[in-house]
Amino acid sequence: RKLAFRYRRVKEIYNTYKNNVGGLLGPAKREAWLQLRAEIEALTDSWLTLALKALTLIHSRTNCVNILVTTTQLIPALAKVLLYGLGVVFPIENIYSATKIGKESCFERIIQRFGRKVV
């Protein structure tokens, strides 16, 4: 029960701040975070902006969804998604952590959920 409550709370926080992670950080950390994101953009030739543009296009299509499979543990992965501003294109239900169960199990779950005819 504790675990179920914890995950419900995590989902609530994720959904509350997926459009406004700055609200979760507070003013001082928000400014540092924005500066860091600007530096990352400059050093990576706007990689994040371009990735977000592609993911937003996919997310806007009615028959398409973005799915994230990571080897990072779930809670740190969700934090990274929020910090990179990707929460708007990755619903929490579509983020899978392969840390404990492995990638193959994650993909089996995705196939069960969405079917085999996925791209």
From Swiss-Prot:
The cofactor binding remark recorded in the entry reads: Binds 1 Mg(2+) ion per subunit.
Required cofactor names: Mg(2+)
GO MF terms on file? histone H2AXY142 phosphatase activity; protein serine/threonine phosphatase activity; protein tyrosine phosphatase activity
What catalytic activity is recorded? O-phospho-L-tyrosyl-[protein] + H2O = L-tyrosyl-[protein] + phosphate; O-phospho-L-seryl-[protein] + H2O = L-seryl-[protein] + phosphate; O-phospho-L-threonyl-[protein] + H2O = L-threonyl-[protein] + phosphate
Q: Name one GO biological process term.
A: positive regulation of DNA repair
Keywords carried by this UniProt record: Activator, Chromatin regulator, Cytoplasm, Developmental protein, DNA damage, DNA repair, Hydrolase, Magnesium, Nucleus, Protein phosphatase, Transcription, Transcription regulation
Q: What is its main location?
A: cytoplasm
Which InterPro entries does this UniProt record tie to the protein? EYA, EYA_dom_sf
Q: Using the UniProt record, name the top-level EC class of this enzyme in a single word.
A: hydrolase
Could you say which EC number(s) this protein's record lists?
3.1.3.16, 3.1.3.48
**GO CC entries:** cytoplasm; nucleus
Cellular localisation:
Cytoplasm; Nucleus
Protein family per UniProt: Belongs to the HAD-like hydrolase superfamily. EYA family.
What does this gene product do?
Answer: Functions both as protein phosphatase and as transcriptional coactivator for SIX1, and probably also for other transcription factors of this family. Tyrosine phosphatase that dephosphorylates 'Tyr-142' of histone H2AX (H2AXY142ph) and promotes efficient DNA repair via the recruitment of DNA repair complexes containing MDC1. 'Tyr-142' phosphorylation of histone H2AX plays a central role in DNA repair and acts as a mark that distinguishes between apoptotic and repair responses to genotoxic stress.
Matches recorded under PANTHER family: EYES ABSENT, EYES ABSENT HOMOLOG 1
Q: Report the protein name in the record.
A: Protein phosphatase EYA1
> What is the source species?
Gallus gallus (Chicken)
Name of the coding gene:
EYA1
